[in-house]
Amino acid sequence: MALRLDDKKAVVAEVAAVAARAHSAVAAEYRGLSVSALTQLRKEARESGVYLRVVKNTLARKAVEGTGFECMQDGLVGPLILAFSLEDPGSAARVVSAFAKTNDKLVVKLVAVGGKQYGPSELERLASLPNREQAISMLMGTMKAPIEKFVRTLAEPHAKFVRTLAAVRDQKQAA
Protein backbone atom coordinates (compact mmCIF):
# COMPACT_ATOMS: atom_id res chain seq x y z
CA MET A 1 0.00 0.00 0.00
CA ALA A 2 1.50 3.30 -1.10
CA LEU A 3 1.62 6.15 1.39
CA ARG A 4 0.33 9.58 0.49
CA LEU A 5 2.62 12.57 0.91
CA ASP A 6 0.87 13.63 4.13
CA ASP A 7 1.29 10.13 5.56
CA LYS A 8 4.97 10.10 4.63
CA LYS A 9 5.51 13.46 6.32
CA ALA A 10 3.76 12.17 9.44
CA VAL A 11 5.94 9.04 9.54
CA VAL A 12 9.12 11.09 9.08
CA ALA A 13 8.05 13.52 11.81
CA GLU A 14 7.19 10.70 14.23
CA VAL A 15 10.44 8.80 13.69
CA ALA A 16 12.47 12.04 13.82
CA ALA A 17 10.86 12.98 17.15
CA VAL A 18 11.65 9.56 18.60
CA ALA A 19 15.21 9.61 17.22
CA ALA A 20 15.81 13.05 18.72
CA ARG A 21 15.15 11.79 22.26
CA ALA A 22 16.55 8.24 21.89
CA HIS A 23 19.79 7.08 23.51
CA SER A 24 20.71 4.44 20.93
CA ALA A 25 19.39 2.79 17.79
CA VAL A 26 19.60 -0.67 16.26
CA ALA A 27 18.70 -1.51 12.66
CA ALA A 28 18.05 -5.17 11.90
CA GLU A 29 17.06 -7.02 8.75
CA TYR A 30 13.83 -8.93 9.28
CA ARG A 31 13.64 -10.76 5.95
CA GLY A 32 11.89 -14.11 6.35
CA LEU A 33 10.39 -13.48 9.80
CA SER A 34 6.79 -14.53 10.25
CA VAL A 35 4.08 -12.11 11.30
CA SER A 36 3.73 -13.85 14.65
CA ALA A 37 7.47 -13.52 15.29
CA LEU A 38 7.37 -9.80 14.45
CA THR A 39 4.34 -9.38 16.71
CA GLN A 40 6.25 -11.07 19.54
CA LEU A 41 9.24 -8.78 18.93
CA ARG A 42 6.99 -5.72 19.03
CA LYS A 43 5.42 -6.93 22.28
CA GLU A 44 8.82 -7.41 23.92
CA ALA A 45 9.93 -3.99 22.68
CA ARG A 46 6.83 -2.30 24.08
CA GLU A 47 7.39 -3.92 27.48
CA SER A 48 11.01 -2.71 27.52
CA GLY A 49 10.33 0.89 26.50
CA VAL A 50 11.80 0.45 23.02
CA TYR A 51 10.31 2.18 19.97
CA LEU A 52 10.20 -0.37 17.15
CA ARG A 53 9.13 0.53 13.63
CA VAL A 54 9.42 -0.74 10.07
CA VAL A 55 9.96 2.33 7.89
CA LYS A 56 10.84 2.72 4.24
CA ASN A 57 14.55 3.41 3.98
CA THR A 58 14.14 6.76 2.19
CA LEU A 59 11.79 7.95 4.93
CA ALA A 60 14.13 6.63 7.62
CA ARG A 61 17.06 8.52 6.07
CA LYS A 62 15.06 11.75 6.15
CA ALA A 63 13.90 11.08 9.71
CA VAL A 64 17.38 10.54 11.17
CA GLU A 65 18.78 13.56 9.34
CA GLY A 66 19.84 16.17 11.88
CA THR A 67 19.73 13.74 14.82
CA GLY A 68 22.46 11.79 16.56
CA PHE A 69 21.72 8.86 14.25
CA GLU A 70 22.58 10.63 11.01
CA CYS A 71 25.59 8.32 10.80
CA MET A 72 23.20 5.43 10.01
CA GLN A 73 21.97 6.90 6.72
CA ASP A 74 24.36 5.02 4.43
CA GLY A 75 23.60 1.66 6.03
CA LEU A 76 19.82 1.87 5.67
CA VAL A 77 19.37 -0.62 2.82
CA GLY A 78 17.13 -3.64 2.55
CA PRO A 79 14.13 -4.55 4.69
CA LEU A 80 15.05 -3.06 8.07
CA ILE A 81 13.27 -2.65 11.36
CA LEU A 82 14.47 0.25 13.50
CA ALA A 83 14.65 0.01 17.29
CA PHE A 84 15.25 3.13 19.37
CA SER A 85 16.13 2.99 23.09
CA LEU A 86 14.08 5.57 24.93
CA GLU A 87 14.76 4.65 28.57
CA ASP A 88 18.40 3.54 28.71
CA PRO A 89 21.11 3.08 26.07
CA GLY A 90 21.11 -0.72 26.14
CA SER A 91 17.40 -1.51 26.08
CA ALA A 92 17.00 -1.75 22.28
CA ALA A 93 20.16 -3.84 22.03
CA ARG A 94 18.91 -6.18 24.78
CA VAL A 95 15.53 -6.69 23.08
CA VAL A 96 16.99 -7.26 19.61
CA SER A 97 19.83 -9.44 20.91
CA ALA A 98 17.52 -11.68 22.94
CA PHE A 99 15.12 -12.03 20.02
CA ALA A 100 17.91 -12.72 17.51
CA LYS A 101 19.15 -15.62 19.67
CA THR A 102 15.86 -17.46 19.17
CA ASN A 103 15.18 -16.27 15.60
CA ASP A 104 18.14 -16.54 13.27
CA LYS A 105 16.29 -14.64 10.51
CA LEU A 106 16.60 -11.37 12.44
CA VAL A 107 20.05 -10.11 11.46
CA VAL A 108 21.49 -6.99 13.07
CA LYS A 109 22.97 -4.61 10.51
CA LEU A 110 23.69 -1.35 12.37
CA VAL A 111 24.13 -0.13 15.92
CA ALA A 112 24.40 3.59 16.69
CA VAL A 113 25.13 5.32 19.99
CA GLY A 114 26.11 8.92 20.63
CA GLY A 115 26.39 9.91 16.99
CA LYS A 116 28.68 7.01 16.09
CA GLN A 117 27.84 3.94 14.06
CA TYR A 118 29.11 0.53 15.10
CA GLY A 119 28.97 -2.87 13.51
CA PRO A 120 26.72 -5.73 14.54
CA SER A 121 29.53 -7.16 16.68
CA GLU A 122 29.03 -4.32 19.19
CA LEU A 123 25.42 -5.31 19.88
CA GLU A 124 26.28 -7.65 22.77
CA ARG A 125 28.55 -5.04 24.30
CA LEU A 126 25.76 -2.47 24.22
CA ALA A 127 23.24 -5.01 25.51
CA SER A 128 25.45 -5.76 28.50
CA LEU A 129 25.37 -2.14 29.70
CA PRO A 130 23.48 -1.81 32.98
CA ASN A 131 20.17 -0.01 33.03
CA ARG A 132 19.65 3.05 35.23
CA GLU A 133 18.67 1.15 38.39
CA GLN A 134 21.56 -1.29 38.05
CA ALA A 135 24.06 1.52 37.47
CA ILE A 136 22.83 3.41 40.53
CA SER A 137 23.04 0.31 42.72
CA MET A 138 26.58 -0.40 41.48
CA LEU A 139 27.58 3.19 42.22
CA MET A 140 26.04 3.06 45.69
CA GLY A 141 27.84 -0.21 46.44
CA THR A 142 31.12 1.35 45.39
CA MET A 143 30.49 4.42 47.51
CA LYS A 144 29.38 2.37 50.53
CA ALA A 145 32.32 -0.08 50.59
CA PRO A 146 35.00 2.27 52.06
CA ILE A 147 32.63 3.43 54.80
CA GLU A 148 31.76 -0.15 55.77
CA LYS A 149 35.44 -1.07 55.88
CA PHE A 150 36.17 1.96 58.08
CA VAL A 151 33.38 1.02 60.51
CA ARG A 152 34.63 -2.58 60.72
CA THR A 153 38.17 -1.29 61.39
CA LEU A 154 36.90 0.95 64.19
CA ALA A 155 34.88 -1.86 65.75
CA GLU A 156 37.64 -4.50 65.54
CA PRO A 157 39.67 -3.51 68.69
CA HIS A 158 36.53 -3.67 70.82
CA ALA A 159 35.50 -6.99 69.32
CA LYS A 160 39.01 -8.38 69.83
CA PHE A 161 38.92 -7.28 73.49
CA VAL A 162 35.55 -8.99 74.00
CA ARG A 163 36.83 -12.20 72.38
CA THR A 164 39.92 -12.11 74.66
CA LEU A 165 37.74 -11.68 77.76
CA ALA A 166 35.52 -14.55 76.63
CA ALA A 167 38.58 -16.78 76.14
CA VAL A 168 39.90 -15.91 79.63
CA ARG A 169 36.46 -16.58 81.14
CA ASP A 170 36.21 -19.94 79.35
CA GLN A 171 39.72 -20.85 80.50
CA LYS A 172 38.91 -20.03 84.16
CA GLN A 173 35.63 -21.94 84.02
CA ALA A 174 37.39 -24.97 82.59
CA ALA A 175 39.99 -24.95 85.38
Curated annotation (Swiss-Prot):
The keyword Ribonucleoprotein applies. One of its GO terms (molecular function) is structural constituent of ribosome. It comes from the Bacteria. Gene3D superfamilies: 3.30.70.1730, 6.10.250.2350. Pfam families: Ribosomal_L10. Keywords: Ribonucleoprotein, Ribosomal protein, RNA-binding, rRNA-binding. GO terms for cellular component: large ribosomal subunit. CDD domains: Ribosomal_L10 (cd05797). One of its GO terms (biological process) is translation. InterPro entries: Ribosomal_uL10, Ribosomal_uL10-like_sf, Ribosomal_uL10_bac, Ribosomal_uL10_bac_type, Ribosomal_uL10_CS_bac. Part of the ribosomal stalk of the 50S ribosomal subunit. The N-terminus interacts with L11 and the large rRNA to form the base of the stalk. The C-terminus forms an elongated spine to which L12 dimers bind in a sequential fashion forming a multimeric L10(L12)X complex. Forms part of the ribosomal stalk, playing a central role in the interaction of the ribosome with GTP-bound translation factors. Belongs to the universal ribosomal protein uL10 family. This is Large ribosomal subunit protein uL10. It comes from Methylococcus capsulatus (strain ATCC 33009 / NCIMB 11132 / Bath). The gene is rplJ.
